[in-house]
Amino acid sequence: MYIMKQSGWLELICGSMFSGKSEELIRRVKRATYAKQEVRVFKPVIDNRYSEAAVVSHNGTSMTSYAISSAADIWDHISESTDVVAVDEVQFFDQEIVEVLSSLADKGYRVIAAGLDMDFRGEPFGVVPNIMAIAESVTKLQAVCSVCGSPASRTQRLIDGKPASYDDPVILVGAAESYEARCRHHHEVPGKSKK
């Protein structure tokens, strides 16, 4: 991380499932609290895998958060004394999150966002590419391929132990029971056209 000379910027943490995005978001938020900064943490209400009132990493690290149904709800929970705004699972929000995150940074807040950069199909996921484009800092994390142990940048969705079809719904909230990290060579999407 580099030193910012002005207040207000946007950091994005992205990567596949099991790459440590939530864990890294929690680490950055904890550092801010150690520095006596006032922090507000948010996540979408759809993310209820481990807790409805906390951001929880797959390894069990957690931090209390506000579960919100729309990006505009963030404004209801921050004040002028807030220094840092963190949002996990940003891929589940609509386009409004891009404007809210940008506006927060413009107003002087340090904004930390985390989310999947690709969906299970291996395609850009929702608003994350737009957030990536406007962020001052982008950290792309990789997991470990569950097949070969190579660095994994893809999320493999499994239905009854088999790769999900390209035509399956993009959003299916789940964890290890439904997903694995895979490298480019072991990521399978039946029905996806080969270019």
Curated annotation (Swiss-Prot):
Residues involved in Zn(2+) binding: 145, 148, 183, 186
Class in the EC hierarchy, top level: transferase
A Gene Ontology cellular-component term: cytosol
The keyword Phosphoprotein appears for this protein: no
Catalyses which reaction(s): thymidine + ATP = dTMP + ADP + H(+)
Active site: 89 (proton acceptor)
Compartments reported by the entry: Cytoplasm
UniProt-listed Enzyme Commission number(s): 2.7.1.21
Coiled coil: none
Keyword Metal-binding: yes
InterPro entries registered for this protein in UniProt: P-loop_NTPase, Thymidine_kinase, Thymidine_kinase_CS
Keywords: ATP-binding, Cytoplasm, DNA synthesis, Kinase, Metal-binding, Nucleotide-binding, Transferase, Zinc
GO molecular function: ATP binding; thymidine kinase activity; zinc ion binding
An annotated GO BP: DNA biosynthetic process
Residues given in the record as ATP binding sites: 15-22, 88-91
One Pfam family in the UniProt entry: TK
Family: Belongs to the thymidine kinase family.
Summary of subunit composition and partner proteins: Homotetramer.
Protein name: Thymidine kinase
Lineage summary: Bacteria, Bacillati, Bacillota, Bacilli, Bacillales
